Amino acid sequence: MLRLLLDTHAFLWWLADAPQLGDSARKAIGDERNDVFVSAATGWEIAIKRAVGKLQAPENLNAMVEESGFSHLSITFFHGEQAGALPMHHRDPFDRMLIAQAQAEGLVIVTRDPYIPRYGVRTLDA
């Protein structure tokens, strides 16, 4: 059993059934034995990018998380401290939060981001 944390692009690719999402990631996300989490940071990132016109995404993503059988992952004060303490390999604050959450909660990040593995977290290629 895996505990997966979806990076924003992996979450959106899953919802859209996009061909960009690789077979291994698709199988792992769809495997009911695995726990799949979507971070509050992902909701925040999507909302900001939608508001500034950089992303078109459905409005009801919160419900889509639940309909997909995924779990919400809240951001805690500890996660915030951990994200701030990370080395500056990656400046994206949303990805830094996902990294901190994955480290704290023992999660595998489903991502295509080449910077995330530099932090020593387990990843699965999206």
What is each residue range found by the language model?
Residues 1-38, 51-63, 105, 114, ...:
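Short, well-structured N-terminal submotif of metal-dependent ribonuclease cores
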Residues 13-14, 49-50, 86-87, 101:
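A generic structural signal for short
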